[in-house]
Amino acid sequence: MTSNDSHRYRVAIVGGAGMWGRHYLTAAAEHEQCDAILVDTSDRRDEFAAHHNVTDVYSTLEELFAVEVPDVVCCILPVQVAPAMVLACVEAGVKVVSCEKPIAIELAEADRIVNTCRDKGVAFGCATAHWEVPLLDETAAWLASGEFGDITSVAIPGGLPVEVSGAGCVQLTQMRGLTGAEVEWVEGYELPSVGAYRAEEASDIEADCPAYGRLGLSNGVICEIPQPRDEMRIPCRVSVTTTQGRL
């Protein structure tokens, strides 16, 4: 990527040796205006740092902030621990902070983070659910126009096989975007946590898990979420049925 701006930015990736954080680390390391910093405690941290020629490596944000306050920090961590890290960045004086979806387990905590960032003048961003699927916004506009008739039912065909909050918020966000409706009631069941998707620091009440059931939407339509089946992973994120057909 080429830019007329010659300024360089110090960008720290917290969890940059993780399953998803590695993509952020690669992006920062390969950008001509970024000096990447890796904050991670995993066994493969040093291997990732060597691969990307990252020389500034720390185990914790506390260690990093004792040396410097970067321009940007990306907190790519499980939702159970991410909010505290985001707020630590804000308090340290970082001016640009991002985290992975969702922002927090509880809406009130997410609101607090957004408001704190706004009050402190911090640019804050979270995830990519609205634009990772091509033509999502355009499809939502077509549905809203009435060209396909009225929406009669909605489903998340693949269910929520590993997480409701972490991996599941993408489907839920895209369902809300396509239908233009909000969830008014929930009826369902949770399943045991999937080991690799649970943060070691998480309490039982914080641990994310698979689930299935029904969601009552503000437009009167019900969204069906079937029980996930290991032997049949369905790639379709959201299915919308209208009086004229199905998308």
What are these regions (language model features)?
Residues 65, 72, 103-172:
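A contiguous active-site-proximal alpha/beta segment in oxidoreductase catalytic domains
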Residues 1-52:
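N-terminal Rossmann-like dinucleotide-binding module
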Residues 14-15, 39, 76, 127, ...:
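Short hydrophobic segments within beta-strands
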Residues 239-247:
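C-terminal glycine/acidic-rich active-site capping loop/insertion
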Residues 7-9, 95, 122, 152:
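Nucleotide donor/acceptor-binding cores
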Residues 155-235, 239:
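Rossmann-like dinucleotide-binding domain that binds NAD(P)(H)
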Residues 52-116:
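Beta-loop-alpha module in the N-terminal Rossmann-like domain of NAD(P)-dependent dehydrogenases
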Residues 25-26, 46, 62, 172-176:
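Active-site phosphate/pyrophosphate- and oxyanion-stabilizing loops and adjacent acidic/basic residues
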